[in-house]
Regions:
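A conserved short helix/loop substructure at the end of the activation segment
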Residues: 298-310
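Conserved HxN/HPN-centered segment at the entrance to the catalytic loop
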Residues: 115-133
Length: 322
């Protein structure tokens, strides 16, 4: 196939997504994705003879970072099927973080995410896709697009008092989140870890209603418990769900909340010290069996969960008692 014919065929395939003013202009074609800043809207990325029409860059969707562009993550159209995809290009970063005196070295690993996509193929609580190398050997991940909002956004959109939420909505949310914990256990049983567990990394699938994990490309090193960072992440999400959002010390102070005087240093989140983990002091109707679970992720804990089974067992005990 000549370059001219290739351009002609690609324009025919992309015609319905191109503006009339662009339908006769040559398309920029990329087979090397190393410099992802050069890959722009309406360009075509070709991977193993399969063309993808690039749409917008993805954006960070949490904690006021809605405008932070992720230039290495692109929305794209599979021009052979017309399906919407997410294309993740190779991007490396590395940092260290400390939780409760434990240091973790974190880094992005496209190879690790590619492995996990194979492991979780067909598992209903994970995103799906495949990896492929471009002509320069970059590991590109092509992901099925999940229609639906994040768990973070879903909780943030709820408009009710906490008591109503806790008794009428939280039980079903917890049931679904426990399936997410079971999914992380599945990963750990396969000697893999998620690496970046956050509430905006769970999408609620609009079609199935299932909670699905996304973004597995972070990895971390820690000598004592290789799954510890995942467990701290699960605890942060659980505290967020029980509280119907973050319970912040500053908000309590601004509200002159009566519980503020009862809070101690050991009652805050071990990772985020401006958030309350001991939620029973804020909402006294939270059962002690559930609050005990939360306190394992507090600054005052003297015992950390070592695996997801321990966490699931305690949550099941809470469910049996209510």
């Amino acid at each position: 196939m000549t370059a001219i014919l290739s351009q002609k065929v690609l324009r025919q395939m992309a015609f319905r997504w191109l503006a009339p003013s662009q339908s006769h202009h040559p398309l920029t074609i990329h087979t090397d994705t190393t410099d992802f800043f050069k890959i722009e809207y309406n360009d075509v990325v070709v991977l193993n003879s399969k063309p993808y029409l690039i749409r917008h860059n993805a954006r960070e969707g949490r904690f006021g970072l809605d405008d932070e562009v992720k230039f290495w993550v692109k929305r794209a159209i599979d021009l052979k099927t017309g399906n919407l995809k997410i294309i993740k290009l190779v991007f490396y970063e590395r940092f260290k973080t400390r939780i409760g005196g434990i240091e973790f070295e974190c880094f992005r690993s496209p190879k690790k995410e590619a492995r996990i996509l194979d492991v979780v193929n067909g598992h209903s609580n994970f995103m799906h896709g495949y990896s492929i190398e471009d002509k320069e050997g970059n590991i590109v991940r092509v992901l099925d697009y999940i229609f639906g909002k994040s768990l973070h956004a879903y909780i943030g959109d709820l408009n009710m008092d906490h008591h109503t939420y806790f008794y009428n909505f939280f039980p079903d949310i917890l049931r679904n989140f426990m399936k997410c914990i079971e999914a992380i256990r599945f990963l750990h049983q396969h000697a893999e870890k998620h690496g970046d567990i956050r509430r905006d990394h769970i999408l609620i699938d609009r079609d199935s209603g299932r909670y699905r994990w996304i973004d597995f490309d972070f990895n971390y090193r820690h000598r004592e418990n290789i799954y510890g960072y995942d467990l701290f992440g699960l605890g942060n999400v659980l505290i967020f769900l029980v509280g119907m959002g973050d319970v912040l010390l500053l908000d309590l102070k601004n509200q002159d909340h009566p519980a503020l005087g009862e809070l101690r240093e050991e009652d805050v989140n071990i990772v985020f010290n401006n958030r309350v983990a001991n939620l029973k002091k804020i909402y006294p109707y939270i059962p002690e069996s559930l609050n005990r679970v939360l306190m394992h992720f507090s600054k005052g804990t003297n015992w950390f969960y070592e695996n997801t089974t321990q966490l699931l067992d305690d949550l099941r005990e809470f469910k049996m008692l209510v």
